[in-house]
């Protein structure tokens, strides 16, 4: 598919904004230092199908400039303070807005919207060669297809926002674009996530310990260099409401039977299928990384518009033999880990991070999720389909590629039919087996 750039513009805030250095909390600094990619797809049809200004770039840029006034950190740049700690320089240098055409392409060409790295063509490339203060924290691209549909590709620097805050910005931008005021203004003060003084961690925090290595490997996985990686494959699997019901039918019932969240049940199934597809020995330790929003877990709860990263991580750890056993065993392991994530645990995590000499050493990446481990991030409770810029809701929103083997996402359905989709990256030989197992229940 050929994509040509129609225009490329730096959009700055529409009014004067505070020129400050924004301190980053510890959760802002243990996320990967890259731009998180995501892609929205919109089909042209119905009443909006005849709109000559469908996804009008000028209208979108004006709304973007308005949104950058209250969300002013998004228009800034990364910088270092005097101690070398990464902070945000709120200098209003702006964000990149690209308009492009794919004259031979159509929304239907993307099929089930599998998040392969090929989707990155729908997102502007960030040039990192000039150092952390040289590049915008947000880049967006509107790509027009021959069918009349549109893709909105977004890459957002992870130090600036987690999924919840990032969507708060995108959805506020879309509201402004269709003439609706911002519902919840951003709260920009990350000192709410300071560690206690003095910091007193009360838990061991295995989530920040090195990921288990494959038994028999020569050196710990977290300390290894960059070995030659096997080829990977990415796919997406849609489980209907009926499929999820059949999964639950495998669980114990009756008086006294445990009640499991949908995430715990689906997570146990994905963890089991991945472990079996990978051929893990029963005694092989495997860790599941579950991103957890701390907003409703911390006491007092954070303001609704808190803008930043409030992500903590639950990490169920078990031998593969237990994971590949009954669905209930896996779900119990996951749910027990999630239930520990209360106010005290989250504050303990903040304290633990405060005591670490180098937070960059804890940043997760390919070494974290690769075999025998897994990351499973749920977007089910995030408002990922609310970005209506005035021309309708997206028919799909998901990650704009999955960079790491062993990383997976759970996505809700755009039409609210109760289905859930699992997008996952695995070694190619493991994916062949995983495809046969994911619907075998």
UniProtKB/Swiss-Prot annotation:
Signal peptide: none annotated. It comes from the Eukaryota. Keywords: Acyltransferase, Plant defense, Transferase. Induction: Induced by the crown rust fungus Puccinia coronata and the phytotoxin victorin. The keyword Signal does not apply. InterPro entries: CAT-like_dom_sf, Plant_Fungal_Acyltransferase. One of its GO terms (molecular function) is acyltransferase activity, transferring groups other than amino-acyl groups. GO terms for biological process: defense response. Belongs to the plant acyltransferase family. PANTHER family: HYDROXYCINNAMOYLTRANSFERASE 2 (PTHR31642:SF166), TRICHOTHECENE 3-O-ACETYLTRANSFERASE (PTHR31642). This is Hydroxycinnamoyl-CoA:5-hydroxyanthranilate N-hydroxycinnamoyltransferase HHT1. The lineage of its organism: Eukaryota, Viridiplantae, Streptophyta, Embryophyta, Tracheophyta. The gene is HHT1.
């Amino acid at each position: 598919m050929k994509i040509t750039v129609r225009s490329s513009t730096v959009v700055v805030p529409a009014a004067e904004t505070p020129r400050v250095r924004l301190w980053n909390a510890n959760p802002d600094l243990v996320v990967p230092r890259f731009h998180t990619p995501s892609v929205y797809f919109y089909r042209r049809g119905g009443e909006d199908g005849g709109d000559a200004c469908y996804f009008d770039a000028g209208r979108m840029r004006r709304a973007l400039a308005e949104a950058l006034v209250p969300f002013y950190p998004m228009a800034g740049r990364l910088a270092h303070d005097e101690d070398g700690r990464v902070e945000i320089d709120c200098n209003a240098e702006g964000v990149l807005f690209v308009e492009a055409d794919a004259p031979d392409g159509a929304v239907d060409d993307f099929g089930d919207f599998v998040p392969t790295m090929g989707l990155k063509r729908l997102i502007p490339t960030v040039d990192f060669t000039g150092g952390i203060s040289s590049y915008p924290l947000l880049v967006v691209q509107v790509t027009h297809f021959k069918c009349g549909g549109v893709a909105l590709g977004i890459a957002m620097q992870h130090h600036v926002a987690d999924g919840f805050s990032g969507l708060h910005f995108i959805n506020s931008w879309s509201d402004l674009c269709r003439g609706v005021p911002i519902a919840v203004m951003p709260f920009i003060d990350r000192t709410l996530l300071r560690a206690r003084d003095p910091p007193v961690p009360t838990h061991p925090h295995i989530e920040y310990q090195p990921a288990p290595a494959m038994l028999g490997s020569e050196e710990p996985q977290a300390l290894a260099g960059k070995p030659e990686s096997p080829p990977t494959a990415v796919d997406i699997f849609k489980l209907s409401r009926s499929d999820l019901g059949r999964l639950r039918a495998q669980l114990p019932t009756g008086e006294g039977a445990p009640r499991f969240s949908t995430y715990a049940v689906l997570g146990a199934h994905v963890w089991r299928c991945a472990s079996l597809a990978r051929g893990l020995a029963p005694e092989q330790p495997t860790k599941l990384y579950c991103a957890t929003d701390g907003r409703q877990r911390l006491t007092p709860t954070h303001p609704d518009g808190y803008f930043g990263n409030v992500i903590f991580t639950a990490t169920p750890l078990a031998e593969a033999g237990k994971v590949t056993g009954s669905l209930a065993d896996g779900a119990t392991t996951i749910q027990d880990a999630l239930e520990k994530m209360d106010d005290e645990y989250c504050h303990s995590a903040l304290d633990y991070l405060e005591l670490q000499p180098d937070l960059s050493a804890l940043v997760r990446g390919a070494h974290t999720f690769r075999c025998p481990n897994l990351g499973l991030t749920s977007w089910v409770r995030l408002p990922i389909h609310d970005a209506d810029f005035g021309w309708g809701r997206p028919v799909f929103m998901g990650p704009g590629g999955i960079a790491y083997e062993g990383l997976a996402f759970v996505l809700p359905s755009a039409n609210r039919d109760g289905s859930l989709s699992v997008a996952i990256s695995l070694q190619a030989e493991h994916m062949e087996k995983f495809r046969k197992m994911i619907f075998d229940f």
